[in-house]
Amino acid sequence: TEEYNGSTWTAGGNLASGRGYGAACGTQTAGLIFCGNPSPNRNTTEEYDGSSWTAGGNLGTPREFNAGAGTQTAALTMGGNIPGIATTEEYNGTSWTAGGNLGTARYTAAGAGIQTAALLAGGTGDTDGTELYDGTSWTTSANMSLARKYFGAAGSQAEAIAFATQSPVSGSTEEFTLGSPAIRTITTT
């Protein structure tokens, strides 16, 4: 774990179990990481208090290559696995329960927002599609100008950014704004 103070990175507490291809959300002093590889981690959660990690509740569906959004006590995991799955789960700080199913099963997507107002973008098959969550169900939204997988996203359901991608590697960034026009490319490299 590394923590950023606005200008430099410093070491934080180590995870109890190393993992890759999972999802995370929260803040520097209240973080959450869930799922990933190797296989014993595919349904586990760890919570960060700013100095150390402790075990949280286990997910109902083991996943990797999933996306996350929300806070440590109100998180959302979306999709994941190969081939992609359409299920989501919601975390209340103690346990995970089933959420609404995505319109499109996907993995390697990125999420932003909170548990009751989330955005999921890109993923499986180099998709450019986005979906919005209202805490109950998902609806299709605007397409990005570039299909993305293995990329990052940040922000809220109403205002988010998607940055970088793999295959081909790109440093492009797109800005999502709920409304019209919904997607705007702000940099392409």
Predicted features, each with a name:
Residues 1-189:
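Polar, enzyme-active/binding microenvironments
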